Amino acid sequence: MKEGIHPNYREVVFQDMSCDFSFITRSTIQTKDTIVKDGKEYPLAKIEVSSESHPFYTGTQKIMDTAGRVEKFRQKFGSKLGKVAK
């Protein structure tokens, strides 16, 4: 590999801000924040969603009634859109 052209690949702490869950992994992300974890200082990347807070992984996923949403849209805007050519 050529020297000086690759980003710094290092251990980084990713912290889910919605549930205060954090994990350490390796990444090339550039951050200004740092955090001390397990007695060592790591760069900190703040994220909004992780496997601890995403509804798919937590089992709190809702199934949306998309047909009902489409009908509601058509009722609201159908007269303004006019006829659709087939």
Swiss-Prot record:
GO terms of molecular function: structural constituent of ribosome
GO BP term, example: translation
Any Pfam family the entry gives: Ribosomal_L31
Subunit structure: Part of the 50S ribosomal subunit.
Keyword Ribosomal protein tagged: yes
One cellular-component annotation, GO: ribonucleoprotein complex
Keyword Heme applies: no
Lineage: Bacteria, Pseudomonadati, Pseudomonadota, Betaproteobacteria, Burkholderiales
Record-annotated disulphide pairs: none
Domain of life, source organism: Bacteria
Stretches that traverse the bilayer: none
Keyword annotations of the record: Ribonucleoprotein, Ribosomal protein
Family: Belongs to the bacterial ribosomal protein bL31 family. Type B subfamily.
Gene responsible for this protein: rpmE2
Protein name: Large ribosomal subunit protein bL31B
